[in-house]
């Protein structure tokens, strides 16, 4: 397979400037990740451990096979969205740790409530993150392990947590349907499990509860007293002894957190789970070029072009790419490669999308679907070309072919936004709405319906036409005063931290970690069979 040769000079001033700019962004990302990893803060953590409980991340660590990685989902979910009175983040990590890890040799989705964050209660973004984890489990046919320690819905936010289709109730809907599909559901009750949340263990295939610590009840002692006048302790109402000896809601009684996690590992060991997909996996080889050089590839000035092959060469095995149609539709690079020995089809932006690029992309997607090869999209796109000439040539029709191919492709799809993600280009390059198994962003990325300058210019033109149509005038200073806040709005709303807080992605990643993250996602996808693709009608 042809080896991609780098034309970059890592000793050049431009490379050094680019690398310094990216390194600053990565340092900021790491700092934010360190903060949210602490959960609810020192006081809450001390209170948690004083009760004999392991900290949430320690629970996850003990559940995993020793030395194996944890592919965490959306660690910065809810960032700055629910500020406390002092301005600090009230819901770091959205109050729940979620991701994919190996347990007793089996890839599993783990959802772990963080009771140090507002008692593990569910904010709107907590629900969204929990549902996203279940979606990952369903798509990849991964057993779910729920480490439950939650006070249920966050009551001040109940209108955004309880009533709608994709609110709290959807968790239990998903549990029931995944169980029906043979996707194991295992609950470990390590603290409170109240009200509707009680259905997490009650609807699991197998449930473990920690004695004198875990509780399960639809109505807690205060509600029971208010409703019936009965005075009862939490343990007598819904403790481990009650539910493993009398009610049968739980199956195994653990003596402490460590024992409970050991029982969970035993439960997974008896699932008789095997990977389903039949990819032709070969021996992995490291790229010939250093991943750390990715820092210097992307220009600090986003207006400067670069060759996306420089990025591909630092991600794929042996820096090898068998490029498809290299002389046609040059603004889209397509080709076959391997990542940690797993075959992939790469689709990477190298400029704006023209009709030729879109047709090439659609053709390549057809090939990958026929061969059942996963697709990897490297997004850096301002959109499809516009103008009278390209419209006459059918850019909408040809762009629709690519969008249709992306939408209907049944192979696992993975998207990494390495630069811009604007307008319909987001759709053609497998944005969130098009169901990629995972979508990550680099810290330099931007995502909006269009760029801030373009949006400000469009709206300013509309306003100027309205003023002048009524016989008025609009000075250059007035126009700039109108456009400046729009630019600021688009910059703020298109920023990766704004996006990741709202779960528009599965996390912001260090560019140097791209290959590792992609390999973990690909490996997880091998647990599900790859379905045949049936394309819709292509307008010819």
Which residues does each predicted region cover?
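Ligand-binding clefts of soluble mixed alpha/beta catalytic domains
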Residues: 1-540
């Amino acid at each position: 397979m042809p080896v991609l040769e780098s034309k970059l000079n890592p000793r050049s001033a431009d490379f050094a400037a680019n690398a310094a700019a990216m390194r600053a962004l990565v340092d900021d990302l790491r700092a934010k990740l360190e903060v949210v990893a602490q959960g609810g803060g020192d006081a809450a953590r001390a209170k948690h451990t004083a009760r004999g409980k392991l900290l949430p991340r320690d629970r996850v660590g003990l559940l995993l096979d020793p030395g194996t990685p944890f592919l965490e989902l959306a660690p910065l979910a809810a960032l700055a969205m629910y500020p406390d009175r002092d301005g600090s983040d009230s819901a770091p990590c959205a109050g729940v740790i979620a991701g994919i890890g190996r347990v007793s040799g089996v890839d599993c989705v783990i959802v772990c409530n963080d009771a140090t964050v507002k008692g593990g209660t569910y904010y709107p973004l907590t629900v969204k993150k929990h549902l996203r984890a279940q979606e990952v489990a369903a798509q990849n046919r991964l057993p779910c392990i729920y480490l439950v320690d939650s006070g249920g819905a966050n009551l001040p936010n109940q209108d955004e947590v309880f009533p709608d289709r994709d609110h709290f109730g959807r968790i239990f809907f998903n549990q029931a349907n995944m169980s029906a599909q043979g996707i194991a559901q295992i609950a470990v009750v390590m603290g409170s499990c109240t009200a509707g949340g009680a259905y997490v263990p009650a609807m699991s295939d197998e449930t473990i509860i920690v004695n004198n610590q875990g509780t399960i009840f639809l109505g807690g002692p205060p509600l029971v007293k208010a409703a019936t006048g009965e005075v009862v302790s939490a343990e007598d109402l819904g403790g481990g002894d009650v539910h493993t000896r009398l009610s049968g809601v739980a199956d195994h009684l653990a003596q402490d957190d460590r024992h409970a996690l050991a029982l969970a590992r035993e439960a997974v060991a008896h699932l008789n789970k095997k990977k389903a997909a039949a990819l032709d996996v070969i021996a992995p080889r490291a790229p010939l070029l250093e991943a750390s050089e990715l820092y210097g590839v992307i220009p600090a000035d986003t207006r400067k072009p670069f060759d996306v092959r420089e990025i591909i060469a630092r991600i794929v095995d042996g820096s090898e790419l068998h490029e498809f149609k290299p002389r046609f539709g040059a603004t889209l690079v397509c080709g076959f490669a391997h990542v940690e020995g797993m075959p992939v089809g790469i689709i990477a932006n190298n400029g704006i999308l023209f009709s030729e690029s879109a047709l090439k992309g659609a053709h390549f997607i057809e090939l990958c679907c026929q061969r059942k090869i996963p697709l990897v999209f490297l997004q850096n796109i301002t959109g499809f070309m516009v103008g009278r000439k390209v419209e006459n040539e059918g850019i909408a029709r040809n762009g629709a072919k690519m969008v249709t191919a992306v939408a209907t492709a049944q192979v696992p799809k993975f998207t990494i936004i390495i630069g811009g993600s604007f307008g319909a280009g987001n759709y053609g390059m497998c944005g969130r709405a098009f169901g990629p198994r995972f979508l990550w962003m680099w810290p330099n990325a931007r995502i909006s319906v269009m760029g801030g300058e373009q949006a400000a210019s469009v709206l300013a033109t509309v306003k100027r036409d309205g003023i002048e149509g009524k016989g008025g005038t609009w000075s250059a200073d007035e126009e700039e005063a109108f456009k400046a806040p729009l630019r600021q709005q688009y910059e703020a709303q298109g920023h990766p931290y704004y996006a990741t807080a709202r779960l528009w992605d599965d996390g912001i990643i260090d560019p140097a970690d791209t290959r590792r993250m992609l390999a973990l996602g690909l490996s997880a996808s091998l647990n599900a069979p790859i379905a045949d693709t049936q394309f819709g009608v292509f307008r010819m």
